[in-house]
């Protein structure tokens, strides 16, 4: 387990890594507080306009120049769906209407959980946001599969196109690496 915390936020004493509650945890032995560390939540949207989906080409690392669904870290005190709306605006300059939670995708090795919402674009206008080199709408046949930035986007897109065949959009759970 990797941790950067050096001092207790409760009493200011140094913390140690200690096996407790069945796993290594950051503990202050002075005041006995356990400092729980939790995965980062990444929220985003699979945005649909007519028969196309929105992808953004990343202008920042990691995976600069690769395509991705608009997504990013959830801010403190922000609702997941509001984060997806914000990220879509920041990356593609477009407004969306959230329909439902579509995929929950676990990346345990990166200590991240992705939540992608299924959303409709309010209009078909997309722009380049501050974190995108390019934003565009793609049909299924046009998706640049080998140029996708992250497995979470590939999972959401594959699942969307499978569900579209039946017209029933379920909520899906995925993990990388797949087990």
Question: Language-model segments: what does each one mean?
Answer:
Residues 63-66, 139:
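Short, basic/glycine-rich phosphate-binding loops at helix/coil junctions
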């Amino acid at each position: 387990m990797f941790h950067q915390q050096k001092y207790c936020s409760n009493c200011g004493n140094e913390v140690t890594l200690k096996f407790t509650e069945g796993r290594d945890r950051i503990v202050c032995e002075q005041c006995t507080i356990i400092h729980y560390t939790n995965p980062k939540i990444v929220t985003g949207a699979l945005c649909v306009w007519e028969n196309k989906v929105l992808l953004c080409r990343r202008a920042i690392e990691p995976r600069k120049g690769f395509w991705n669904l608009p997504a990013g870290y959830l801010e403190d005190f922000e609702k997941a769906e509001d984060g997806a709306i914000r990220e879509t605006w920041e990356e593609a300059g477009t407004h969306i209407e959230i329909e439902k939670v579509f995929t929950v995708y676990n990346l345990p090795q990166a200590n991240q959980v992705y939540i992608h919402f299924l959303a409709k674009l309010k209009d078909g206008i997309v722009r380049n946001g501050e974190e995108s080199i390019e934003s565009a709408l793609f049909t299924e046949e046009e998706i640049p599969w080998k140029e996708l930035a992250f497995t979470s986007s590939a999972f959401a897109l594959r699942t969307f196109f499978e569900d579209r065949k039946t017209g029933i959009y379920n909520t899906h759970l995925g993990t990388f690496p797949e087990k």
